[in-house]
């Protein structure tokens, strides 16, 4: 995939970049793997705003992705590489030998016609899914489970990857994309390779309207709000925040204040915290 640049024909186009979508082979998704996606606009079941900066955007359909990769021993062949509006990574449609079709995250380097399999006996090549105990030390992986059989939860964004560092008893040491080293049960599955579409982070949105197409609403500074809306609000003109440290909209210290629970159950599985910690 390459980055496409635009000529500065307007202020919005100046500096804008996008993907050239060279890897995408079709714009027609598999209908049997689509599900309706009801947009909530950041509201809960009482209609109250619980997640800011969400709302609007283009209508989407959800693509049902196989994060479990539990179709053991049955080879599949990649039929298409597709764009997914619900995630940064591309997805691949796999046709299995028994006739079933499933979407998987498209790893870097996968192409139409590539054969993928799952299970303890699968080869160590991009797109194959195995239990961590069967993956050699030093292998790059993605789509990692935290509980056996639950489906991949870690390392799913475009361009991300993790690395198997070692094996200790029933756990496997994995270095995540953030630099954190974590112990994960050896029965959990992971997919070989790096997630594709690695140029995604280099894309320049270019204008506010493009964020609105994606369902992202504006972020407003607290200092321009009223006192009842934000701790930084109020005052005459451009007033300072009037506090010894910046605050979140809910009155909690921010910008460097640690928010992780002191007694988090997952602490015992973290061997080394992420790089900036």
UniProtKB/Swiss-Prot annotation:
GO terms under biological process: cytoplasmic translation
GO CC terms in record: large ribosomal subunit
MF GO annotations: rRNA binding; structural constituent of ribosome; transferase activity
Keywords for this protein: Ribonucleoprotein, Ribosomal protein, RNA-binding, rRNA-binding
InterPro entries hit by this protein: NA-bd_OB-fold, Rib_uL2_dom2, Ribosomal_uL2, Ribosomal_uL2_bac/org-type, Ribosomal_uL2_C, Ribosomal_uL2_CS, Ribosomal_uL2_dom3, Ribosomal_uL2_RNA-bd_dom
Region Disordered, residue ranges: 38-58, 219-277
SMART domains: Ribosomal_L2, Ribosomal_L2_C
Subunit structure: Part of the 50S ribosomal subunit. Forms a bridge to the 30S subunit in the 70S ribosome.
Cited NCBIfam families: rplB_bact (TIGR01171)
Family, per entry: Belongs to the universal ribosomal protein uL2 family.
Function: One of the primary rRNA binding proteins. Required for association of the 30S and 50S subunits to form the 70S ribosome, for tRNA binding and peptide bond formation. It has been suggested to have peptidyltransferase activity; this is somewhat controversial. Makes several contacts with the 16S rRNA in the 70S ribosome.
Protein name: Large ribosomal subunit protein uL2
